[in-house]
């Protein structure tokens, strides 16, 4: 919780297959939960975003264009979503997932591709298809009211992120070079 808000963030390209329609539906479904807010950061210019949404208004969603510094967004988020459509786009890695974990932010990610190598169900987050909108919304609502689980997920997220640290990678490369 940040300022009594459970902030759900998604960072992605302005592409339908990245799950933007699903994100909007989930936010709409949770609109009556005043303590939950949504943040969508798109890797696009503002004019492209304006054209895509054509002046739609969202009660509980803040939409941002391309950002140079994401730290301020991560540091004020409670949960990060990756809603890539499992039948249209398979994440091979998922940099935003690892970044979220490094900030100690739990994640909800697709149950295929790279994310399943990063996230263990129930430890750092949850593996749920973006097409399971009700299930994602229910999990968000549950987490927003369960501080203990969020604290445990956050601790596990930070620990998992260490596996992807630059120092660890450099150490492994040095071992190979020196072998």
Describe each PLM feature range.
Residues 11-17, 37-50:
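Glycosyltransferase donor-sugar binding loop
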Residues 6, 15-29, 134:
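A conserved mid-protein helix/loop that constitutes part of the nucleotide-sugar donor-binding site
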Residues 135, 142, 149-163, 172-175:
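A short, well-ordered alpha-helix in the C-terminal region of glycosyltransferases
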Residues 75-90, 105:
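Acidic donor-binding loop of glycosyltransferase active sites
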Residues 75-77, 96-106, 110-111, 121, ...:
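Conserved donor-binding/catalytic loop of nucleotide-activated donor transferases
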Residues 92-97, 115:
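Short glycine/serine-rich donor-binding loops of glycosyltransferases
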Residues 120-122, 126-133, 141-147, 162:
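Conserved acidic donor-binding segment of nucleotide-sugar-dependent glycosyltransferases
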Residues 49-68, 79:
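Nucleotide-activated donor-binding/catalytic signature segment of Leloir-type glycosyltransferases, i.e.
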């Amino acid at each position: 919780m940040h300022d009594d808000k459970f902030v759900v963030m998604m960072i992605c390209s302005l592409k339908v297959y990245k799950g933007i329609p699903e994100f909007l539906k989930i936010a709409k479904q949770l609109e009556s939960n005043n303590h939950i807010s949504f943040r969508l950061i798109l890797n696009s210019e503002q004019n492209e975003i304006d054209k895509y949404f054509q002046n739609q208004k969202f009660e509980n969603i803040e939409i941002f264009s391309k950002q140079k510094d994401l730290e301020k967004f991560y540091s004020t988020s409670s949960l990060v979503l990756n809603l890539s459509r499992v039948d249209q786009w398979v994440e091979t890695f998922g940099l935003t997932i690892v970044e979220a974990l490094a900030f100690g932010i739990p994640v909800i990610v697709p149950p295929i591709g790279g994310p399943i190598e990063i996230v263990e169900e129930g430890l750092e987050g949850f593996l749920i298809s973006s097409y399971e909108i009700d299930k994602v919304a229910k999990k968000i609502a549950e987490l927003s009211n369960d501080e203990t689980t969020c604290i445990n997920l956050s601790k596990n997220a930070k620990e998992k992120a260490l596996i992807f640290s630059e120092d660890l990678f450099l150490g492994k490369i040095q071992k190979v070079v020196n072998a």
